[in-house]
Amino acid sequence: MSDPGLVGVVGAGTMGSGIAHVFARSGFRVALCDVDTRFLERAMGQIRTNLGREASKGKLAVAEIELALERIVPTTERKDLARSAVVVEAAPERFEVKREIFRALDAILPEEAILASNTSSISITKLAAETRRADRVIGMHFFNPVPVMALVEVVRGMATSDATFAAVKELSERLGKTPVEVNDAPGFVSNRVLMPLINEAAFAVMEGVATVEAVDQVFKLGMAHPMGPLTLADFIGLDVCVDILRVLHEGIGDPKYRPCPLLVRMVDAGWLGRKAGRGFYRYEG
């Protein structure tokens, strides 16, 4: 039988650590699982830093920092997730990786447990088909930085039950998020609309229409965007953008989703954006 106070998170990268943070801050015990102890150590350090930042802004009592951290158990063993009522997968945006995780979790989780994916573009219906609990598979697409961003796209697969949707909607609200119902389609709403913008911005630079800075200024000053599309691409990660565009291109078939060759070359060069110190812009520290 599942433990209603225990949540599993698979993947201790930027998104996984942020998801673990908001669950722990909301009173849940969290099993944070990754195959690499270095990612787990980095995630725990980032969570501590972010909780401290919240406390310094008066959003969290200082005493709550240690309490929240104590609720998170980092682990490399998936068996430590076996009693979770909900598991949120936050692995890299590749179907083969997620499929293996879903199959493994389906084999060890209680029958009533919900399997959620933080995927930003991959089909929830396809992931659900890899399990024996398709009615209890759903998308929980959080946004980066997770502790700050209010939205969760709650994505219904073809077999997702009303009870599963209602449970995840309520869970999202307990985390202080606003859940928005979305049906399963490549990229859902967010990336189906956002990624063509980033892609066209990259084409504009590649074709010499404008500089990186000029493209971003057009959107910041002319359209009141808080940051330009290329700054945002660096923040998301250019490798993530290319992965999502490939999923969209394959799933929808429209050439507008074909990744800009400049984006692909930058990823090949290791210029992944802010996390790598270089993308469309250079970053220090």
Name each region found by the language model.
Residues 1-50, 57:
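NAD(P)+-binding Rossmann beta1-loop-alpha1 motif at the extreme N-terminus of oxidoreductases
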Residues 31, 63, 174-177, 191-198:
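Structural/interface elements that position substrates and couple domains in central-metabolism enzymes
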Residues 114-184, 188-192:
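Rossmann-fold dinucleotide-binding core
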